[in-house]
Amino acid sequence: MPVTELAAFTTIAHNAVTPELLAACVQAVEVQDEWCAANLTSTPLGHEARGAALFQQVEDPAVILMTAHWASVAEHGLWIASEENERVYPAVQEHIDNDNIRFFHVDGIEAFTIVEDDEGAVPVLRSPVVGIALFSVVKDRKDEFESVYAGVKNIKDEFAKPYVHRGGWRIEEVEGREDVEEYVVIGGWESVKAAKEFSKSKDFDKYSDAIASVTLSVEVEHYKRLF
């Protein structure tokens, strides 16, 4: 099963993504591309085909997000341990708060698509804004959440069209919350304003009430692509 990598960093440049940081991140992605082409024969060529991209958060511009698709967490681990990564990552570290990194994988999805099978659907990497919703769920209610979410998922999907949204469970444990699982939904929007219009739609209360009945909290972030 594929996994989607989400790595969120906080810049040390007062809410700015400096040219130096952007250049370091782009170089890291390009070197990663070369490494994948040489070492992972089943991986598609090109960073967009791999879901590898860089985003800046709208709510907090100091937060940048790097993404990629991998066949497994173990496959990603091979890149992390590589000489190539050890060579390029320090240039990124110079520009971020290394004590404030959020890093995890989402199970079973390739969220940052560049093409979609459905005619007219807009891939996430072609979306003006990307939304990430984090649903905190008590572990014992994981199956219940899946059942409830499946019953109302179409409400958001229909409202969001032609943009595509996909979700999966966070693989790594939520730090300091051993009794909590996190379900992550990633998808595109025309704008942040358009995303917020969902809360005013006619079926939102049905969706919201159902989600509230099986979650501890819901956090929503929005991002714009840098690379």
Put a short name on every predicted segment:
Residues 1-227:
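Short S/T/G/P-rich N-terminal loop/turn motif that feeds into the first structured element of a domain
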